[in-house]
A protein has these predicted regions:
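Hydrophobic alpha-helical connector segments
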Residues: 55, 69-96, 149
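All-alpha amphipathic helical-bundle segments outside canonical DNA-binding/catalytic cores
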Residues: 80-81, 117-118, 135-150, 164-167
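C-terminal peripheral helix-coil segments that are non-catalytic and often amphipathic
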Residues: 85, 124, 128-136, 155, ...
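Amphipathic alpha-helical packing segments from all-alpha helical-bundle domains
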Residues: 93, 110-136, 146, 160-161
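Basic, helix-initiating cap at the start of DNA-binding domains
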Residues: 1-21, 25-34, 51
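Short linear capping/connector segments at secondary-structure termini
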Residues: 102-110, 190-193
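Short hydrophobic/aromatic patch on the recognition helix
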Residues: 36-46
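Alpha-helical DNA-contacting segments of helix-turn-helix folds
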Residues: 52-60
Length: 193
């Protein structure tokens, strides 16, 4: 048996397990066995499985925020290409976990707050980029950036849950953005970054 797994190690291993198998499929026994510790040790650090999963979700959110900040700091490209980079980052994020995990987190009430905060963060980022595109007349004037961002994110998630492959989702986003673009916007989307 391992001596004294750290809280960070427990969170890291649990994150890997729930990302690969979904929240419901992972049992506390499996987590303890994988770490080589007793369930009692786990329960000394986390009140229950939900507390442990919440800690994992917090760590995942933190990591995703860092990725978005890094994406935002990348220079180069026009505003629509930046929207494409952000949507690609969102898509890549959805593929870091199994579709069962996405389904579990969106349905379990106890994790609703984590799910909502995560979606709101992505939606806000995407809306900001889309607003910039509208202001620069790269998107059609009738595009409502918040509604467009929300609908695009919902559609991407639904397609991911239904087994659409990553490259198809990327092509879908590019096609949707081209359809929402002005002539100038379409030219910029088609330009190589």
């Amino acid at each position: 048996m391992k001596r004294g797994a750290t809280k960070e190690e427990i969170i890291r291993i649990t994150r890997e397990l729930i990302a690969r198998n979904g929240i419901r499929a992972v049992r506390v026994d499996e987590i303890a066995q994988t770490l080589g510790i007793s369930k009692r040790t786990l329960y000394e650090m986390f009140t229950d499985k939900n507390d442990l999963v919440s800690a994992c979700l917090e760590a995942m959110s933190h990591q995703q925020r860092e990725r978005i900040v890094a994406c935002r700091k990348r220079r180069g490209g026009n505003p629509l290409q930046k929207v494409l980079r952000l949507t690609n980052e969102y898509i890549d994020n959805l593929y870091t976990v199994d579709h069962r995990f996405l389904s579990d987190i969106s349905r379990k009430i106890i994790f609703e707050e984590h799910y909502d905060e995560h979606r709101e963060f992505w939606r806000r980022e995407l809306t900001d980029y889309l607003e910039t595109c509208r202001q620069e007349q790269l998107l059609l004037p009738e595009i409502d950036a918040p509604a467009f961002a929300e609908q695009l994110m919902n559609t991407i998630l639904d397609l991911r849950l239904n087994g659409t492959v990553r490259e198809e989702l990327r092509l879908f986003c590019r096609t949707i953005l081209r359809g929402a673009g002005t002539r100038k916007g379409i030219e910029l989307i088609d330009r190589k970054p």
